[in-house]
Each structure stands twice: as C-alpha cells, then as structure tokens.
C-alpha cells in the first residue's frame, strides 16, 4: 500500500522499539528527501553501502601497505552478494556494518599514530630505545576518539556491535603493549595495562556508551515515545 502512495497504514502512536534509532533516522532522512517510496527508503542504504566499500579499501590499504590489495578488497566487497542486497534494502545491517568498519579503520589508524609518536619520542631524544622506561603517556589520541564515536553510532544502530567493541578495545590495548615492548620498555611494559588501558577504556567504551545514550535524545526529550511514561504508570 505504501508503494501505491497510501501511507495511512502508518500508526500515529509509538510502537515497540526493537532497535536503537540511528539507522532508522538515516532511513527516515532518505524518505524526507525523496518521499515515502521505494527509492526514498532505500537511498540511505545505498549511500552507506558505497561508503562501506570506500572505508574498506582504505582500511585494507593501510593494513597491507598496498594500493593494489586495498583495491582488490573493494572490488570483492562491491560484488559480494550480501553487500549488494543490503545496500538496496531498508534494513539496519548496512549502517551497523559501516560504523563498525569505520571504527576498526580508525583503530588501525590509531595504532599507526601511536607507533609514529613513539618513534618521534625516541628520535627527539636521540636514543635507540626506551631503555626500560615506560615512554610517553599518550592520552588524547584523535583516531581512538573517532573510533569510540563510530562504535557508539554502531551501538545506536544495533546492539550486536557491543561484541565488536569489546573485542577491538582489548586488541587496541594489546597493540599498545606490543608497541611499548618493541620500543624497549622492558618490564615497565606491564604498566600499560593501566596507563594505556584506562585512557583506552574511556576513549572507546565510555565514549561509545555516551554517544549511544545521546542517540536516544529525542526519546528523552519528548513524551510520546514507546514506554516513555512507564515509570509514572
């Protein structure tokens, strides 16, 4: 009925919220631009499907150090059946996939950023390694913060992203520990569990949960959302 122009089937009252709102906002943005029709509700999925391919190319290129391999990854994803279908369907999975891959791409960029800062630290002091010292405390790391925001948006699309957040937060800390060990921190490497672990927890886990909570701003700011008055009732 919707494709024939009858949108009266849409309910005026709020219904059960199965998933968080970010992906639904994006679908609604396409409908706002192009109307409640098959193109309007697919538009955002198409855009994010294309962006997913671009981010994948950049991620694989950064990991492999090869433009060719990055390009091949993009080609393979372009012709992947699931990517093809999800980019043309008004479902949430393509949005969550994009935000998750973006989060991982930012973490990989942070890994490179962190190692470059360690190398610069050694170069400025004209030393070969840390010599058993812990090294610089790099707390504000822009790429890691960007990753936390991306994870938060992924959580704001579907809760499934929580598993990826937990896994990659631990992996990011492991990368830091490995980098300090390679730089010669020696026995002080274990201090990274707290001195790098706490900033990582704040930048990834806490920030992503703050972003996730922020995605519900419209629910908190209005009174007509599903179960909005459950406490009073």
Language-model segments: what does each one mean?
Residues 1-225:
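Membrane-integral, polyisoprenol-dependent glycosyltransferases
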